Amino acid sequence: MSNRKIFVQDVTLRDGMHAVRHRISPTDVKRIVTALDAAGVDAIEVAHGDGLAGGSLNYGPGSNTDWEWIEAAAEVLEHARLTTLLLPGVGTISELKHAYDLGVRSVRVATHCTEADVSAQHIETAREIGMDVSGFLMMSHMAPAEELAKQAKLMESYGAHCVYVTDSGGRLVMNDVADRVRAYRDILDEGTEIGIHAHENLSLSVANSVVAVQNGVTRVDASLAGHGAGAGNCPLEAFIAVANIEEWEHGCDLFALQDAADDIVRPLQDRPVRVDRETLTLGYAGVYSSFLRHAEAASERYGIDVRTLLLEAGRRRLVGGQEDMIVDIALTLAAQATKEAV
C-alpha cells in the first residue's frame, strides 16, 4: 500500500464551525491556519459551517462574516491552498467570485446526494475563473452506490476535478464506502479524482477514510482533533498516523498536528467533540451531523430526549437545510406525550 499520494484537505475551519456554533474569532482562525500550514496540509477550508452565506436564523448566525474569516486565513497562509464550500441556493455566484478575489483558489460545491444537477452553474463558473473544483455529494448513505456514481458523473460533466463520497451523517460502514468509491471509479474518467469526507458518529471515520484510499481515493478530508459536526470529522492526526504506518505519501508533520489539535483546537470547544449517546444516535439514525446542536437546543426547550428527536429525524429522512424541522418534531412529540398523560 506504499507510494499512494494523499491530498490532505483540512476542514477544521468549516465543518468545525458547527462544533462551536459558527463562533470563532479571526485571531483564532489565524492561529489554526498558521499551525496547519506549518504542519504541511495541502488545503485549508474556511467558511461558515454551511458554506458561504450560510449564516442565518435557520442554520445559525456566525460570530463573523465569511469574508472576515477568509481574510484572516489569507493573511497568514503561505503554502496550503485556501478552500471554501458553497451550497447552491445558499451561496451565490457573486459570493463565489468574491471569495476568489480574497484569495480562495479551490471550492467544493455541495448538494444533496441526488441533486447534483443544481451544481452545474456554480461548478462551471468556478472552472471559468480558474479554481480547483470538487463536487460534494452530501448524505451519501441515502443513495445506492450506482445512483450516487451517476450523480458524481454529472458533477464531472459540469467540470469538477474531483467528486466526494460525503458521509454527512456518519452512517456509512467500510463496505458502503468501498462500494461507492468503486462505483465512482468505474464511471468517472481516469483523470477525475475521488475524495472522502467522513464523520466519526459510528467511530469509523479513520477506518472509512483508510478503506477509501485503499480503493482509489486521493483526497481525504480531516480536521484537527476531529473538530466538526456531530462526533466530528476524521481526526487529522490519527489519520496521518495510519498514513505513516501504511507508508502513504503526504506532506504532514504528525507531531505538529497533534500539538495543534490539543493546544489550540480542543480548548475552543464548548461541547466535547466525541462519540457519546447523542452523536452515536446521529450515525445510527443516519441524520445530518449538523443537526446535533439544533436537536440539543430543542430537547432542552421542549423536554424531549435528544435521541428520540434524532431517531424521528432519521425516520423522516430529513436532509441538510431542514434544521427547522427539529422544532416541528419536538412540538409533535411533546403534544403526543401530553395527550398520553391525560
From Swiss-Prot:
EC number: 4.1.3.39
CDD domains: DRE_TIM_HOA (cd07943)
Catalytic residues (UniProt): 18 (proton acceptor)
Residues annotated to bind Mn(2+): 15, 197, 199
Catalytic activity, reaction form: (S)-4-hydroxy-2-oxopentanoate = acetaldehyde + pyruvate
InterPro entries: 2-IPM_HCS-like, 4OH_2_O-val_aldolase, Aldolase_TIM, DmpG_comm, DRE_TIM_HOA, PYR_CT
A biological-process GO annotation: catabolic process
Protein origin, superkingdom: Bacteria
Assigned keywords, A-Z: Aromatic hydrocarbons catabolism, Lyase, Manganese, Metal-binding
Catalytic class of the enzyme: lyase
Binding residues annotated for substrate, in chain numbering: 14-15, 168, 197, 288
UniProt domain Pyruvate carboxyltransferase: residue ranges: 6-258
One annotated GO molecular function: 2-isopropylmalate synthase activity
Pfam family membership, one: HMGL-like
Marked site (Transition state stabilizer) residue numbers: 14
SUPFAM superfamilies: Aldolase, post-HMGL domain-like
Family, similarity comment: Belongs to the 4-hydroxy-2-oxovalerate aldolase family.
PANTHER family found in the cross-reference section: 2-ISOPROPYLMALATE SYNTHASE 1, CHLOROPLASTIC-RELATED, HOMOCITRATE SYNTHASE-RELATED
Name of this chain's protein: 4-hydroxy-2-oxovalerate aldolase 2
Species: Rhodococcus erythropolis (strain PR4 / NBRC 100887)
